[in-house]
Amino acid sequence: MPKSVIIPAGTSTPIAPFVPGTLADGVVYVSGTLPFDEFNNVVYPDDPKAQTRHVLETIRRVIETAGGTMEDVTFNSIFITDWKNYAAINEIYAEFFPGDKPARFCIQCGLVKPEALVEIASVAHIAK
């Protein structure tokens, strides 16, 4: 099955061997997305809402570059560093998924940079 690499303009160059997204057989797989600027610096330290918005906007760019929309998202994996930020993260998350919500899970864990508060990976099925 052929796959296409998805790298939207303005996306940071990953600091590990992966790409922001891949498209295969109508499915977009978005790598774990952190609140990084194009130079891999964490944006909005100590602001879980702003970091979540930045992460979801980056995910949206990956999915739109592949030809989809956020309505095509079927699953999200959410990683947070502290449960105290859960409500703030969910508030912004709900703005990006106002209708039928995708399935998801959320766990607390450490992230690659200590200033990062949230990481999200997504799967979207693009209508053919």
UniProtKB/Swiss-Prot annotation:
> What HAMAP family does this protein's entry cite?
RutC
Record's keyword annotation contains Transferase: no
The record lists the catalysed reaction(s) as: (Z)-3-aminoacrylate + H2O + H(+) = 3-oxopropanoate + NH4(+)
A GO molecular-function annotation: deaminase activity
List the Gene3D superfamilies: RutC-like
Matching entries from NCBIfam families are given as:
RutC
A biological process term (GO) from this entry: nitrogen utilization
The residue range of the signal peptide is none
> What high-level taxonomic lineage is stated for the organism?
Bacteria, Pseudomonadati, Pseudomonadota, Gammaproteobacteria, Enterobacterales
Name of the protein in its database record: 3-aminoacrylate deaminase RutC
On whether Membrane is a keyword of this UniProt record, the answer is: no
